[in-house]
Curated annotation (Swiss-Prot):
SUPFAM superfamilies named among the record's database cross-references: PLP-dependent transferases
Name of the protein this chain belongs to: Glutamate-1-semialdehyde 2,1-aminomutase
UniProt keyword terms in alphabetical order: Cytoplasm, Isomerase, Porphyrin biosynthesis, Pyridoxal phosphate
Keyword Cytoplasm in record: yes
InterPro entries assigned to the protein according to its UniProt record, in alphabetical order: 4pyrrol_synth_GluAld_NH2Trfase, Aminotrans_3, Aminotrans_3_PPA_site, PyrdxlP-dep_Trfase, PyrdxlP-dep_Trfase_major, PyrdxlP-dep_Trfase_small
EC number of this enzyme: 5.4.3.8
Main location: cytoplasm
The family this protein is said to belong to: Belongs to the class-III pyridoxal-phosphate-dependent aminotransferase family. HemL subfamily.
Pfam families cross-referenced by the UniProt entry: Aminotran_3
Species assigned in the record: Cupriavidus taiwanensis (strain DSM 17343 / BCRC 17206 / CCUG 44338 / CIP 107171 / LMG 19424 / R1) (Ralstonia taiwanensis (strain LMG 19424))
Sections of the chain in a coiled coil: none
Modified residues (N6-(pyridoxal phosphate)lysine): 270
Gene Ontology CC, one term: cytoplasm
Cofactor section: pyridoxal 5'-phosphate
Length: 430
């Protein structure tokens, strides 16, 4: 029995399903999860000593690669002065100033510890600011596991939930909790216009992943985001970009810089923690003024602005501002997507791939999907076979056909060539 299997068997005795986040259980693809012991650069090693080229990157944060020496040093130096204070620090101010500088739509920002906290707090703030209740979200978009957002959501819910019903995607969420959440089709401008016409003056906020990454990778169209911006402005609704995944990942200023659309509020996470638990929400100064202790919208967190996370995040934000960083990252990610598509064509496998900045999507279907419905037309059985074949050849992809992948600055041409070699063998087996 492998060491990975031994650990999985042991974990299931004390941890529900043996994991602390459902997608890690390999339920979607089958088989035994890999228990990771260490990581460096573009590589991870499991409990059996197997090395993998990593295309998960902790689901996005590891944009400069694992265990970057400067990030490690910053965390070590900070840890020498204690792990947490429960009081303000100067580093928090520096982090806030850096975020506001790099994302101009954010005039003020509040640090939290997870993406779920960021989106949950942003929606509460939008409702408090507008005095309205109704929220619009989109099919397949995942905004964390807050109750009101678990309706036709993406990520692990595409494996575990019934996505055909316009009802809570998770047990334990009363229908009453989600009755103020309207779910529309991603990239459907007409449906969005109809919703605003029918519910004029009632909509508190529209929340969207401008590049969806939790139903695999799906780009928003320019027309979709532009219509969203115009409708929110006209109706007085708050436009929230959930950039927990795309922030500092698809461009230095996030997806909003990529598209040239200015939201009212933005949620950030992943990259801003450099691999440590950190997230943030921010936006217009007048909206943020409604937040306690200034206003009546309450939000708090014992570990918000944690010194270790801020140290890792600030160092990562410094590294990604190096000249040409995003040009190189986008070029390598596009090269990966194109190379995998070419390998699939050579093997006669129906397949398409897409890339935005440092994110990519792999689809076992003809054509790149533009909606949740199109994503679900992918051949998941074929993906599962491909996933395991790649794993056997030392390439670690997301263990689900409904998750985006991530490239780091450490994925050089040699790493991509090794990936293509593995893919040619894997497509033959798929």
């Amino acid at each position: 029995m492998s060491r990975n299997q031994q650990l999985f068997d042991r974990a299931q005795q004390t941890i529900p399903g043996g994991v602390n986040s459902p997608v890690r259980a390999f339920r979607s693809v089958g088989g035994t999860p890999r228990f990771i012991t260490r990581a460096e650069g573009p590589y991870m090693w499991d409990a059996d000593g197997q090395r993998y080229i990593d295309y998960i990157g902790s689901w996005g944060p590891m944009i400069v690669g694992h265990a970057h020496p400067e990030v490690v040093r910053a965390v070590q130096e900070t840890a020498a002065h204690s792990f947490s204070f429960g009081a303000p620090t100067e580093a928090e101010i520096t982090m806030a100033e850096e975020i506001c500088k790099l994302v101009p739509s954010i005039e003020q920002v509040r640090l939290v510890s997870s993406g779920t906290e960021a989106t949950m707090s942003a929606l509460r703030l939008a409702r408090g600011f507008t005095g309205r209740d109704l929220i619009i979200k989109f099919e397949g978009c995942y905004h964390g596991h807050a109750d009101s957002l678990l309706v036709k959501a993406g990520s692990g819910l595409l494996t575990f939930a019934d996505t055909t019903r316009n009802a809570p995607s998770s047990a334990g969420v009363p229908a009453d909790v989600t009755r103020h959440t309207m779910v529309l089709e991603y990239n459907n401008v007409e449906q969005l216009e109809q919703a605003f016409a029918k519910h004029a003056g009632e909509i508190a906020a529209v929340i969207v992943e401008p590049v969806a990454g939790n139903m695999n990778l799906v780009r928003a169209s320019d027309a979709f985001l532009q219509a969203m911006r115009e409708l929110c402005t006209r109706d007085g609704a708050v436009l929230i970009f959930d950039e927990v995944m795309t922030g500092f990942r698809v461009a230095l200023g996030g997806a909003q810089a990529h598209y040239g659309i200015r939201p009212d509020m933005t949620c950030l996470g992943k990259v801003i923690g450099g691999g440590m638990p950190a997230a943030a929400f921010g936006g217009r100064r007048d909206i943020m003024a409604s937040l306690a202790p200034l206003g009546g919208v309450y939000q708090a967190g014992t570990l918000s602005g944690n010194p270790l996370a801020v140290a890792a995040g600030l160092t990562t934000l410094k590294l990604i501002q190096a000249p040409g960083f995003y040009d190189r990252l986008a070029a390598q990610t596009r090269k990966l997507a194109d190379g995998l598509a070419e390998a699939a064509r050579a093997a006669g496998v129906p397949f398409s791939a897409d890339a935005v900045g440092g994110m990519f999507g792999l689809y076992f279907r003809d054509g790149v999907p533009a909606s949740f419905a199109e994503v679900t037309q992918s051949d998941t059985s074929r993906f599962n076979r491909f996933f395991h074949a790649m794993l056997d050849h030392g390439v670690y992809l997301a263990p689900s056909a409904f998750e985006a992948g991530f490239v780091s600055a450490q994925h050089d041409d040699a790493i991509l060539d090794a990936t293509f070699d593995a893919a040619r063998k894997a497509f033959a087996a798929a």
